[in-house]
Amino acid sequence: MTDAWSSRADAYRTSAIHSAGDDLDLVVEWCEPGEGVTVLDVATGGGHVARRLRDAGATVVTADPAPGMGADTTAPAEHLPFANSSFDVVACRLAAHHFADVSAAVTEMARVARRAVVICDNTFVSAASEEADRLRDPTHVRNYAVAEWHSLLEQAGLEITDERFMERPLEIEPWLDRAATPARDRARVVELLGDRIVDGWMDLPTLVIKGQK
């Protein structure tokens, strides 16, 4: 699985939906970056959250399970190699749907955070969408509904203080290209997503949620 992500590192770095967006702006804002603030960016991918936080004055450490992503630390979200309360804030954007054990990952993020955890991920949950996601990218585990995110954060000992739901515009062809989806599967993915796709685009339901200790 990590080999697959490593091979896509450049695609994640240049991806329009990863490198910009209201969700990225909000994750950065809710981390409250500034001089003296330390942040761990979990599953950093193309490093977009880390870059924005550093530009805002925060000290950022990046972690990712895929060596090819070039993170400061190669580690899965479920096993973060840091002491308790090592960072003011822990951020994780557009990655949790890949985690083998999302509950363990959120618990680990809460453990190494002093103040808060900020998570952003897709909430497109249906049988058809899950089949489409796995067909497009076998590293996809599953998306989680808003109520599930509430439970995950609360079980990790976090108090939910902010949340915002939004829809992000997703261009289908680059999305399929980024995962190197085989030609035989692309048509089926489009079929499964059905009339959600309009003129080659679809709106992707997304949640940004913040939990404090």
Residue ranges: model-predicted function:
Residues 1-34, 48-52, 116-141, 173-177:
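Conserved class I S-adenosyl-L-methionine
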Residues 142-157:
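Short alpha-helix
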